[in-house]
C-alpha cells in the first residue's frame, strides 16, 4: 500500500496528515477552517486518495500559517507515499469546469518542484478565507510533493467556483498521474532511470 503519515509541529501549527494513494477518496479534514476543509474534501473525493488532516493552528492571527503548513505536510505525505515512483503514469492534465469557470491543471510527478499559478479571484475573500491563500496552498503542496504543477483558470466569475475548479482539477490530474501504468512493469518513467533530479 502506498501510504504515509507526516507530523509537523511548529510554534504556529501542529499538523498530522495521512494519505493512502490507493484509497477510495475518503476525507477526514479538520483544520478549523470550514472552506479549506471543503477544498480538502474535494481533493480527496476526486483524486480517490484517502486524506486525513488534523491541524491546530494560530487561527486567531489568520488562516495563512495553517493553510500553508497543511500544504507542506500533505505534499510531503504524497511524496513519501510515492516512494521511488516506479510504475506511475507520471504526466496528466485536466480541464475542470465548475459552472461558468474553466480551469486547466497539468502535472508532472517528477521530483522536480515548480508551480505556475494563473488564477484571478474577483473577490478578496470566500467567506472568511482569503483567496490569496489558494495560491499559497498550491505553492506549498507543489514544492513539498516534488511535482511540477501548472494551474490556469481560463475564465470564471465566481471566486468559490474558481477555487473549487483548481482543487478538483488538481485532484483528477493527480489521480491520473500517480496511477500505476500496467504496461510499465514497475519501471521508473524516466530515461534517467530515476526521478527527483
From Swiss-Prot:
Location relative to the cell: Cytoplasm
Catalytic activity, as annotated: D-erythro-1-(imidazol-4-yl)glycerol 3-phosphate = 3-(imidazol-4-yl)-2-oxopropyl phosphate + H2O
UniProt main location, coarse: cytoplasm
Associated pathway: Amino-acid biosynthesis; L-histidine biosynthesis; L-histidine from 5-phospho-alpha-D-ribose 1-diphosphate: step 6/9
BP terms from Gene Ontology: L-histidine biosynthetic process
Coiled coil (residue ranges): none
Similarity-based family: Belongs to the imidazoleglycerol-phosphate dehydratase family.
PANTHER family: IMIDAZOLEGLYCEROL-PHOSPHATE DEHYDRATASE (PTHR23133:SF2), IMIDAZOLEGLYCEROL-PHOSPHATE DEHYDRATASE HIS7 (PTHR23133)
Gene3D superfamilies: Imidazole glycerol phosphate dehydratase, domain 1 (3.30.230.40)
Native organism: Rhodopseudomonas palustris (strain HaA2)
A Pfam cross-reference name: IGPD
GO cellular component annotations of the record: cytoplasm
Protein name as annotated: Imidazoleglycerol-phosphate dehydratase
EC number: 4.2.1.19
Record key words, sorted: Amino-acid biosynthesis, Cytoplasm, Histidine biosynthesis, Lyase
GO molecular function: imidazoleglycerol-phosphate dehydratase activity
Principal EC category: lyase
